[in-house]
UniProtKB/Swiss-Prot annotation:
It comes from Drosophila melanogaster (Fruit fly). GO terms for molecular function: ionotropic olfactory receptor activity; odorant binding; olfactory receptor activity. This is Odorant receptor 49b. Residues 50-60, 143-176, 273-278, 364-375 are extracellular. One of its GO terms (cellular component) is dendrite membrane. The lineage of its organism: Eukaryota, Metazoa, Ecdysozoa, Arthropoda, Hexapoda. InterPro entries: 7tm6_olfct_rcpt. It is a multi-pass membrane protein.
């Protein structure tokens, strides 16, 4: 169905396999049920553990990761029809651009498909590395520990055969969790990347106006229709971005708060862990957080910049040679582009690289305080 749109094809295929999109079968209830049960055992463990600071930080990271994973699955199911409508919008807009048979647009479509496919595979690769880190962590410990701290009331999970059974269970659900968490992130980033393509297509169309309708040799009616079509396309991009915001903005806010705290804690964990193997595993955890956040913030920032660039492209239409009504239309278009639509964080502020830098600065500040207090 989406084989031609490699930007989102792999992500939808995985989510569809687990029946989180389009299909509805037993796999949906198996993956969500097992993950929810696992979160319950993690919460029980965190409430009763006597582990040291290192263990608490590591297991807090796991707990937040699993909660975020199940939250994404529930959001997909709760807003299932709205996600499908958004994907349908992307599909229709994609083929509309493809059918233009414009060499520039075809080139950027090919490029975004390649980048999207590479990103989806890269994120899954990072996920597999992290899963290996989860599984190898108990092997690097001097005592019996599980990949994820968890406890079933009434059982001693460190006694045989419960330990072996619980270890196998956790290693089996880890790839399942990756397939719930990572494709969702890659899908949302893919939707944002296509928004960038649409902005570039609009800029290209506006720059063609001066070439197709030169001053002194233009049909006023055709020019008016072209400008109106560009304005409508700009509005469709804004509506597309609003649709993404409605589905994701609060989740992005939760992730920012959770991962900021976890990133600070994991950095602190780097200076208190003992052993090279544990150090490598903690670095893998940090890399996964940064890889997920940076991809989102990078493309969300680029989408905002490309929306802003629409104003420059509109100015290059030689609008000052148009009739007065068309000049007003172009001016309104430029004014709207100078207040660029953006992917929002909690419907409060746009997601930009500046925000990502602030996140790192704040995290490092708290890390420095912890280091001075406990170092």
């Amino acid at each position: 169905m989406f084989e031609d749109i490699q930007l989102i094809y792999m992500n939808i295929k995985i989510l569809r396999f687990w029946a989180l999109l389009y299909d509805k079968n037993l796999r949906r209830y198996v993956c969500i049920g097992l993950a929810s049960f696992h979160i319950f055992t993690q919460i029980v463990y965190m409430m009763s553990t006597n582990e040291g600071l290192t263990g608490i930080i590591r297991n807090s990271y796991m707990l937040v990761l699993w909660i975020n994973t199940v939250l994404r699955a529930y959001l997909l199911l709760a807003d299932h029809d709205r996600y499908l409508a958004l994907i349908q919008k992307l599909t229709e807009a994609y083929y509309d651009l493809l059918n233009l048979n414009d060499s520039y647009i075809s080139e950027i479509l090919d490029q975004v498909n390649k980048v999207g496919k590479l990103m989806a595979r890269g994120n899954l690769f990072f996920g597999m590395l992290t899963s290996m880190g989860f599984g190898l962590y108990p092997l690097s410990s001097s005592e019996r520990v599980l990949p994820f701290g968890s406890k079933i009331p009434g059982l001693n999970e460190y006694e045989s055969p419960y330990y072996e059974m619980w270890y196998i269970f956790q290693m089996l659900i880890t790839p399942m969790g990756c397939c719930m968490y990572i494709p969702y992130t890659s899908l949302i980033v893919g939707l944002i990347m296509f928004g960038i393509v649409r902005c570039k297509a609009l800029q290209h169309r506006l720059r063609q106006v001066a070439l197709k309708h030169p001053y002194g040799d233009r049909d006023p009616r055709e020019l008016r229709e072209e400008i109106i079509a560009c304005i409508r396309y700009q509005q469709s991009i804004i509506e597309y971005m609003d649709h993404i915001n409605e589905l994701t903005t609060m989740m992005f806010l939760f992730e920012l708060m959770a991962f900021s705290a976890l990133l600070c804690a994991l950095l602190f964990m780097l200076i208190i862990v003992s052993g090279t193997s544990q150090l490598i595993i903690v670095c893998m955890y940090i890399n996964m957080i940064l890889a997920q956040i940076l991809a989102l913030y990078w493309y969300a920032n680029e989408l905002r910049e490309q929306n802003l660039a629409v104003a420059t492209a509109a100015y290059e239409t030689e609008w000052f040679t148009f009739d007065v009504p068309l000049r007003k239309n172009i001016l309104f278009m430029m004014m709207r582009a100078q207040r660029p639509a953006a992917i929002l964080l909690g419907n409060i502020r746009p997601i930009t690289l500046e925000l990502f830098q602030n996140l790192l600065n704040t995290t490092y500040t708290f890390f420095t305080v912890l280091k001075r207090v406990y170092g």
